Amino acid sequence: MENLYQEQESNYKTLFSMAMSTKKLFLVFFLALVMSPVFPAQVDDMMIRDHLRKIYQITGMSIPEKDSPEYPKILFVDQDFIEQMACKGEACDAPAFTKGPTVFMADDLDLEEILGESILYHELVHVLQYYNYGRNDGCKSWSKRELQAYQLQEEFVNERGYDMPWLRSVTHYLAAMCDRWHK
């Protein structure tokens, strides 16, 4: 029980630092109080490192050191939290989002299934994009990064013998998504 309390306290510290960087302090604290607990994902660190190395091999984006504050942190959250933070409170289909080095994943995703693991891979692309290039500076930057993340996710899925046609079609909607979420 002590360990669970420490993990949850660490998660609230992550939420607090995110709030300070986005100036959404009230919203984040409100969500932290009313949402279901945030739990660190039980993700094998070797999986994360393997994915980061693969992304590096393809893109050349450098990887933060494991003990760096920029090294990825994976947290499971409920869908309401994702909708509040990634979709400005509107209902959306986003199963995850990334803020700096922190990946927030819907708590119903299974990382042992190809969909869940490929979404983690997609979000790790965003972690490395942030680490290498900083924040998005607008819709054009956001669209380019999303396009790269979806293309790498599709390669990841295909290499494992799966096909997810929606990965190819979603890139056609990036401009509309940009207008909706990144005004």
Predicted feature locations:
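Bacterial N-terminal signal peptides
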Residues: 28-34
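Short alpha-helix carrying the canonical HExxH Zn2+-binding catalytic motif
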Residues: 113-128
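Second-shell loop/turn segments in exported
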Residues: 106-110, 136-142
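N-terminal amphipathic/basic-hydrophobic helices that include classical n-h-c signal peptides
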Residues: 1-19, 161
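Catalytic Zn2+-binding segment of zinc metalloproteases
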Residues: 124-140
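Bacterial N-terminal signal peptides that target proteins for export
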Residues: 18-26
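Post-HExxH zinc-binding segment in Zn-dependent metallohydrolases
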Residues: 139-172
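Auxiliary, metal-adjacent structural segments of Zn-dependent hydrolase domains
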Residues: 41-103, 110-113
